[in-house]
């Protein structure tokens, strides 16, 4: 008996509940009854909810596995492929669609379209009528998909425009703390869930970890947004804390952002203030733990993740801390004999960078250049967004997406950090002189707060422990080059040096 292989596909997951799949199966069963000299292979290729318009099914779906099986000889010549119609194989542009058909036929695989019982084989490539028919079917399928795609895009474009101009709701889909009103024209917050959100933000502002917050909610039998008790987890809380819908913003997906679709402010009803939301983001985006289990405050590294070794790029760590002794900053690669840079006294570095620069950072920027600081961050945000957009485009053609996805994740984190810094700069400016000098650097809470402020103020600090100098990159765009660490440069001296700044850089 001859072997037949079935391929079934539909484009939208919503079609799963429709008749598309049953119809295709019915056509295959009816054909096999009439053609009793064929048997159906146990392997059936199905792309359920995968579009053929852009060829996704041929890149990552079951159809791509079918093509690989043909090219590697796992499916032998003389096999027949059963499909409902040619548009199941491709809805791409005519040239690409015909090439896919030719690829199958040239490997000795016959194709039978069950809707019209047409047989395509290798001889069909030399028959004008068969080829023209296939081209016309491919052309029609592509045009239908183009029209559907255009209609959907125009529909969503109008919905987004209406949402921007008048706040019209685009879809009933909304965050779990909201619901549609009876008229289906506005979103209404759930009072109990809003109280839960406020509690979570309060706990986070107390600098509790995500696990500690989850434990608190579970211990107090606080229901999650599915109505279940003791079901909170740290990942759910992390996503909630970062959700801009809490301050009324509708955020498009990665891919939508890559196509230039922007956020819609005021789309959802606000349930917390901007100040509270962005204050929590500063905690969330800092790449260090919320609390140190040690009782010795001096073990808290004020420049953690910020200060890097000039020789190898690794983040500097603290060493030989005991009691009230500050110890040293050292490259972690030194103990592994992979970096030969010496350690440097920590008290010298901290005094020069923390007491003189960080505590006076509001003055390390001429008033007339405040706009430039905003522009620097805005340009950085645009550059990061363009990099993300380019990687999103690469995702559609790259065979290995894991590495690209990781790059997008890291860039997105950097983008969010820059966005929070810009928001802080525009809304509150940099913390005032008195705010900084109220910090108690001998206490655990004071040092943790100082560490967060340093992370927010300095983009990075590149330290050369041989020369006892460093390059300091401020988040506002200013750069101090070769800043000395063995002698004290007062804040006033550093501020006075701003008059010699060229292209945002000052050399010491």
Curated annotation (Swiss-Prot):
The active site is at 11 (o-(5'-phospho-dna)-serine intermediate). Residues 175-290 bind DNA. Residues 3-163 form the Resolvase/invertase-type recombinase catalytic domain. PROSITE patterns: RECOMBINASE_DNA_BIND, RECOMBINASES_3. Disulfide bonds: none annotated. GO terms for molecular function: DNA binding; DNA strand exchange activity. The keyword DNA-binding applies. It comes from the Bacteria. GO terms for biological process: DNA recombination. Keywords: DNA recombination, DNA-binding. Encoded by the cryptic lambdoid prophage DLP12. This is Uncharacterized protein YbcK. It comes from Escherichia coli (strain K12). The lineage of its organism: Bacteria, Pseudomonadati, Pseudomonadota, Gammaproteobacteria, Enterobacterales.
């Amino acid at each position: 008996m001859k072997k037949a292989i079935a391929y079934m596909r539909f484009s939208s997951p919503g079609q799963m509940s429709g008749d598309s799949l049953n119809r295709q199966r019915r056509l295959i069963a009816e054909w096999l009854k009439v053609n009793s000299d064929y048997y159906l292979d146990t392997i059936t290729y199905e792309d359920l909810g995968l579009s053929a318009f852009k060829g996704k099914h041929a890149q990552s779906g079951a159809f791509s596995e079918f093509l690989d099986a043909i090219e590697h000889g796992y499916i032998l010549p003389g096999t027949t492929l059963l499909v409902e119609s040619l548009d199941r194989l491709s809805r791409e542009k005519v040239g690409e669609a015909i090439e896919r058909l030719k690829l199958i036929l040239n490997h000795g695989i016959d194709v039978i379209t069950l809707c019209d019982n047409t047989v395509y084989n290798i001889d069909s490539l030399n028959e004008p009528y068969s080829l023209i028919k296939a081209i016309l079917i491919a052309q029609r399928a592509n045009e239908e998909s183009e029209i559907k795609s255009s209609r959907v895009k125009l529909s969503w474009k109008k919905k987004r425009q209406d949402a921007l101009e008048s706040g019209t709701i685009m879809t009933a889909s909304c965050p779990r703390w909201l619901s549609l009103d009876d008229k289906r024209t506005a979103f209404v917050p759930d009072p109990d869930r809003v109280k839960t959100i406020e509690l979570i933000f309060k706990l986070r502002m107390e600098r509790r970890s995500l696990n500690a917050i989850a434990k608190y909610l579970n211990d107090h039998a606080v229901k999650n947004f599915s109505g279940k008790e003791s079901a909170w987890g740290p990942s759910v809380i992390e996503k909630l804390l970062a959700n801009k819908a809490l301050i009324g913003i509708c955020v498009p997906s990665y891919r939508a952002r890559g196509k230039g679709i922007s956020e819609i402010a005021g789309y959802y009803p606000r349930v917390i203030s901007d100040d509270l939301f962005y204050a929590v983001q500063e905690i969330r985006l800092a790449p260090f733990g919320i609390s140190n289990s040690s009782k010795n405050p001096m073990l808290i590294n004020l420049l953690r993740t910020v200060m890097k070794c000039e020789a190898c790029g690794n983040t500097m760590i603290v060493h030989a801390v005991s009691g009230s002794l500050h110890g040293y900053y050292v490259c972690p690669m030194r103990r592994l004999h992979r970096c030969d840079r010496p350690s440097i006294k920590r008290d010298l570095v901290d005094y020069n960078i923390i007491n003189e620069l960080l505590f006076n950072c509001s003055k390390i920027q001429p008033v007339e250049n405040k706009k430039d600081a905003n522009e620097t961050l805005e340009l950085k945000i645009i550059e990061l967004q363009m990099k993300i957009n380019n990687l999103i485009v690469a995702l559609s053609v790259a065979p290995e997406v894991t590495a690209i996805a990781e790059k997008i994740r890291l860039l997105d984190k950097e983008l969010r950090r820059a966005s929070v810094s810009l928001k802080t700069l525009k809304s509150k400016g940099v913390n005032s002189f008195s705010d900084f000098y109220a910090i108690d650097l001998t206490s655990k809470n004071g040092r943790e707060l100082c560490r967060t402020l340093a992370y927010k103020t300095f983009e990075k600090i590149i330290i050369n422990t041989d020369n006892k100098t460093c390059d300091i990159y401020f988040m506002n765009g200013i750069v101090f080059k070769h800043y000395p660490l063995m002698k004290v440069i007062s804040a006033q001296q550093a501020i006075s040096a701003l008059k010699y700044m060229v292209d945002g850089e000052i050399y010491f």
